[in-house]
Amino acid sequence: MRKLMIPVLVIALALMLMSLFVIPEGERGIVVRFGRVLKDNNDITRIYEPGLHFKMPLFDRVKQLDARIQTMDGRADRFVTSEKKDVIIDSYVKWRIEDFGRYYLATGGGNSLTAEALLERKVTDVLRSEIGAREIKQIVSGPRNDDVLPEDASSDEVNTEAAREALEIDGERDLIMSDVLRDTRESAMKDLGVRVVDFRMKKINLPDEISESIYRRMRAERESVARKHRSQGREKAEIIRAQAELEVATILAEADKTARVTRGEADAEAAKIYANAYNKDPEFFSFLRSLRAYEKSFSSKNDILVLDPKSDFFQYMNNAKGAKAE
């Protein structure tokens, strides 16, 4: 009897250990019995929270599923716009398992790679439909005036052709992401049992051949704008230069006029002073004028004067009183 007790205890201990299982933090567990997901009395999949749980050994199999939000970084794919032009969009999806039983069955045993492949197909189909209904300009830009120009943009920046076109575009990039999130969330929950938490377009590129064409157009536009600004600058410079020259000519004319008036007034005042002086003492005035004439006449050593000694020019040399020589 004792010999049988030991094997029985070992088997009982083994069965007890096999009936215990632990669900780690951040995961959830479901129990599969005879190939079917174990459900409660309400026909709802029984979810095992993190912690220690029991199962029927040999009959039950525990499948642990990640309950955290997961990120599916999709590959960049090519889409066609309403203009029949190609764009390359790189996006990502954040998702988590909501219905663990449905997820387990839809993915063939809870395979996350299968889940992401199915989810990526759904996202791509919806995104392809959204892109096909819009033009490139609507896809690459956000809401109108959202990220086109800053609030303190100068008038020159607003007046460029590219800026005017951008302001006229009602960008729908955010609307596209919102629509994809809404439509994908509904179908993903229904078919896969997962909840799409977020969808974002990381990068929107153009194929090389289209990019080169757009770059050439942008370069031509910029060169045209630069030429326009240079032409306007030269025109403004000519206007400023002409205005400056006009102001200089006006100032010089006014200065010359003022100088002439001042000179005339000074000459008149000098003549008046001379006249008054002459009236007060004509003899002295005549003497002073003769002295100035002598100084001016004899200032140069090379000058030769041939004069009659009895001429009026020498009247003060011949007579201190200025009497004329006879």
Curated annotation (Swiss-Prot):
Chief place of localization: membrane
Topological category with respect to the lipid bilayer: Single-pass membrane protein
Keyword entries, A-Z: Membrane, Transmembrane, Transmembrane helix
UniProt-annotated location(s): Membrane
TM ranges: 4-24
Signal sequence region: none
UniProt-listed Pfam families: Band_7
Domain of life according to the entry: Bacteria
InterPro entries: Band_7 (IPR001107), Band_7/SPFH_dom_sf (IPR036013), HflC (IPR010200)
Cross-referenced SMART domains: PHB
GO cellular component: membrane
Protein family membership: Belongs to the band 7/mec-2 family. HflC subfamily.
Record function comment: HflC and HflK could regulate a protease.
Oligomer status and interactors: HflC and HflK may interact to form a multimeric complex.
Protein name listed in UniProt: Protein HflC
Organism of origin: Vibrio parahaemolyticus serotype O3:K6 (strain RIMD 2210633)
